[in-house]
Amino acid sequence: MFDGVFDYVVDATLRGGHGLFMGRIPNVWYGNQYSRSGGATDYNRFRSFSDTIGVMPAASVADPRFFWLGPTSDYQVRGAYFGDAQGTDPDFEAPSSWRSNLALDLVTANGYEITFEYNLDDVNEGVFYKDLGLERTGQLADGRGVYDTAGDYWLTNASGGGAEAFTWSINKNFNGLNALLAYSTVDAEDIYPLTSTQAESSYGYTQRFDGENLSPRPSSFMIDEKWIFSLDYTAKLIGENDTRFSLVYIRKSGENYSVTYDTGYNSVGGASYGGYDLAYIPTGAADPKVNFANAAVAAAVMDHINSGKLSNYKGTYAPRNAFQGPDYDRLDLRITQDFNVWNDHKLIVYLDVLNLMNLLDDQKGIVEEYSFNNSRQIMVNGVDAQGRVNITGVDPDDSLSVINFNGQSVWQVNLGFKYSF
């Protein structure tokens, strides 16, 4: 198919650019210091009736000052509902990155259109959350620190992270049949995935091993590899009217995810939410750094570890987003039929068969992901007197589920029309 592609080039374009880029500032980040002020407001108590509430500063509820606290308030202000006070570094800068792009477009004498493109993204100012009350109080047998936290989160900047992407594509028309083949690969890293508007959630839902000792890791939003193949053919099957067939196949890598301890509500390290402690991977049933509930549990856990990529991390912890979920592929078909009605008036009827693979086989074309890029595979019940995590079981497929909230894991048939004039 591609014989003679590079025999000679009739047109070549080199393009590129470099610059500092900043997106729209997410103002919601700044709102945390107002909604989590540590005691300047007492709305929660006011909403729920209490006899202890005395005279408020203003007499009329129509006056916004009715809800303000002041020296005339004769009741005791409790701590904030969330028990924390949050702030923003006065030198905080909105996220920005240096971006570079270089691309080469080629057209050959026999009609091939070929593109190579490279993109580099280097973080200039990233986002980092600190807990100003974080205090290391001990260490577990696996080496992770134990921390007391206050929940006083501080929005500040950090360097580190970025992305590299390489793409190539080949396009050619073969006597009415247009074919496209494209491939892209991405390597992207970040420190905080920043999936929440609230500071405590962005902080607590970031998988970690030891407190705030965080380094850039593969992004939760990265698609490692992606292939696209399409065929498009137009013929005149009904008089002089165009009949068009379009077929698009996509295959892409699964999302990154982390393997963590299933600890219930509480974290073993104290610096994250429960279930977001990165798992230490035992070397075997006799690993002195963990405590298995019994021999059967040890055998089940080690069988799971030895059966996959977890075995690469024996004797240490599995880093954040060190694993990939199942790959995904799908095939879409569109058929359109034009009907010339009168002069420039045209009726276009179209038929879409989305996820054709799932129509032919209900086990194909299914998107499977780990919820919030997190899989609590090692079940844990606290820590023993020697600082060893008590391992009670294993759940190899924890949080792995079929994603179908937009219908991406089922087939669909759409029939419609458009009238243009």
State the predicted function of each range.
Residues 3-154, 159, 274, 315, ...:
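Solvent-exposed loop/turn elements at secondary-structure boundaries
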Residues 243-342, 373-401:
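Extracytoplasmic gating/loop element in the C-terminal half of outer-membrane beta-barrel translocons
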Residues 1-5, 105, 169-173, 232-236, ...:
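Transmembrane beta-barrel domains of outer membrane proteins
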Residues 14-16, 104, 114-116, 170, ...:
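Membrane-embedded beta-strand positions of outer-membrane beta-barrel proteins
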Residues 2-12, 110-111, 173-176, 236-245, ...:
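Short loop/turn motifs that connect adjacent beta-strands in outer-membrane beta-barrel proteins
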Residues 117-259:
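Gram-negative outer-membrane beta-barrel transporters
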